[in-house]
C-alpha cells in the first residue's frame, strides 16, 4: 500500500492521563535524585479532587509524596476548582509497597556482576525511525505533538486567555508512493472558558495554534479543520475523565506508525526494560536511518525476567534497506550491547531526566538529556556496512 491516509494523535500536558504520567515521572525523578539505584514503579490515578499514588518502590530516599503531585498539577495549570481541579485543595492518597523479593533477586547484582543485571520483567519492545522529518520521526505524530505543545505555550503566555489545560490533537496525512504528500485533516479539541464565543475560539486555534506550527507546503488545498467538533469543551482534565499512568502509550511513541510491545514508560526506573529497552531500540533504529542504511527501520528486542541477554532481536526496513535486514541485525549485534545494565550505562539513564519525557512524546525531541536521540553510531554503522 503506497497511497493512503494515516492519522496520529497527541494530547496536552493537561490531559488527565498525561497529568498522571507527569506525576509518576516526577516521583521517579525525585527518588533518583537521592538514590540512583532505587527500584520504582509508581502508578497514579487522578479524578475529581483526588490523586492516588500506588505501586512498588524500594529506596532509601526521603521524598514528599504529597507536595510533588501538587507541584506538578500547579505547574500544568490546574489551580482552581473553577476549571475542574485545584492543586491546593485536592486530596492525595498513597499506597506503596516494596519491590517483590522474587523480582529483585533476578535484577540486583553485585558490583562485579552488574553488567549481567537481569531484565526486570519479560517482554518485547520496539524502536522506530524514518526519514519523514529531520528528527527521524513519522510526520503525523511529530506534528500532533507540536500542536498541543503550541496550545500549552499560548495558554501559559496568556496570548489566548480562554484556553484551559486539557487538549487533544489529531493529524491525518496523505501518503503517495510511501512518502508524506500533504496534511488533509487537523482535529483540535481544547478545553476553554465558558464565555469565549465559538467564532473567536475557532479562529484563534486555526491562526495561533495550527498555522504557526504546520509547514505551509504540507497543507492540502482542501484541508479540513475540525475545532472542538462537539461545540463545547468546558469540563475537562481530571474532572472530565479519570486519568491513569500509562494509558497513552501510542502517543508516547510513534503514533501508531510502528508496533508497540504494550509496556508503558512513566513512573518506571530504567531497570524496567519496558522503558530502557524501548529507548535503546529507538537509539538503534535512529542510527540505522541516520547512517543512510534504510529510510525506515523498526527494531524489536525481547527479554526474559532475570536474564541479561535479549532472547531475540529483529530488524525490519520495509523494503527501504541498503543491505538485507538479516545483515542489519548482525551489524546491530556487533555495535550495540542491549543488556539492561549496558543500556543504562550507554544512555546514562540513572539521572532524574524523566519528567520532560512525560508529555509531548518520548522520542523525536531535541533535549540534551534525551540520550537515546543521539546519532553518534551512524558513521561506524555506515563504515561497517561498507556503503
Curated annotation (Swiss-Prot):
GO molecular function, one term: methionine adenosyltransferase activity
The keyword Transferase is annotated on this UniProt entry: yes
Residues that, per the record, bind Mg(2+): 17
Residues reported to bind K(+): 43
Primary location: cytoplasm
Key words of the record: ATP-binding, Cytoplasm, Magnesium, Metal-binding, Nucleotide-binding, One-carbon metabolism, Potassium, Transferase
GO CC field: cytoplasm
Catalytic reaction list: L-methionine + ATP + H2O = S-adenosyl-L-methionine + phosphate + diphosphate
PROSITE patterns assigned to the protein according to its UniProt record, in alphabetical order: ADOMET_SYNTHASE_1, ADOMET_SYNTHASE_2
Binding site for ATP: 15, 166-168, 232-233, 241, 247-248, 264, 268
Annotated cofactor note: Binds 2 divalent ions per subunit.
Pathway(s): Amino-acid biosynthesis; S-adenosyl-L-methionine biosynthesis; S-adenosyl-L-methionine from L-methionine: step 1/1
Gene3D superfamilies, alphabetized: 3.30.300.10
ATP-binding keyword on record: yes
Source superkingdom: Bacteria
Transmembrane segments: none
Region (Flexible loop): 99-109
Cofactor entry: Mg(2+); K(+)
Signal peptide, first to last residue: none
EC number: 2.5.1.6
Residues annotated to bind L-methionine: 56, 99, 241, 272
Pfam families to which the protein is assigned, alphabetical: S-AdoMet_synt_C, S-AdoMet_synt_M, S-AdoMet_synt_N
UniProt family annotation: Belongs to the AdoMet synthase family.
Function: Catalyzes the formation of S-adenosylmethionine (AdoMet) from methionine and ATP. The overall synthetic reaction is composed of two sequential steps, AdoMet formation and the subsequent tripolyphosphate hydrolysis which occurs prior to release of AdoMet from the enzyme.
Assembly with partners or alone: Homotetramer; dimer of dimers.
Record protein name field: S-adenosylmethionine synthase
Source species: Nitrosomonas europaea (strain ATCC 19718 / CIP 103999 / KCTC 2705 / NBRC 14298)
